[in-house]
Amino acid sequence: MRAVYILAMACAATLQASSSALPSTKDLNSQVESLVPSDITDSAHVGGVRLLRVEDKEEETEEERGFGGALADGLKKLNPAKAAKKAKEKAAKIKQDLKEIGEHAAWLEKMRETIGKD
């Protein structure tokens, strides 16, 4: 039963702290209007309210809606021909690495024999 009371108090304290940390919207608007110097920033004012961002080039703005863009990109990555080509390239690289390791091991063994003879 104590756990329920502790949990309720923790929730109440969290809600109280989070709600008191945010200023009211009236105070927020007045702070934005009074604290931003107009000579430093190039801002647009409409009806006495400062706009944060202005986009002049609307033609270049592209939005991806739905799954079209993500789905097309995913399907491009799932090309089986490219996957087979990549697997073949990886296998060739592994074979080359194994060949080089074998050559290095043979050279190392030869050097050990040469050092051991002296």
UniProtKB/Swiss-Prot annotation:
Induction conditions? Expression is induced during host plant infection.
Of the GO CC terms on this record, one is: extracellular region
UniProtKB keywords: Host cytoplasm, Host nucleus, Secreted, Signal, Virulence
Query: Which subcellular locations apply to this protein?
Result: Secreted; Host nucleus; Host cytoplasm
Q: Where would one find the signal peptide in this protein?
A: 1-21
Q: Does the keyword Signal apply?
A: yes
The record's annotation in InterPro entries points to: RXLR (IPR031825)
| rRNA-binding listed as a keyword | no
A Pfam family: RXLR
Question: What is the superkingdom listed in this entry's lineage?
Answer: Eukaryota
Q: What positions does the record give for the motif labelled RxLR-dEER?
A: 50-64
The UniProt function text for this chain reads: Effector that enhances P.infestans colonization of Nicotiana benthamiana leaves.
Per the similarity annotation, which family is this? Answer: Belongs to the RxLR effector family.
How are the domains described in the entry? The RxLR-dEER motif acts to carry the protein into the host cell cytoplasm through binding to cell surface phosphatidylinositol-3-phosphate.
Q: What is this protein called?
A: RxLR effector protein PITG_19617
Q: Which organism is it from?
A: Phytophthora infestans (strain T30-4) (Potato late blight agent)
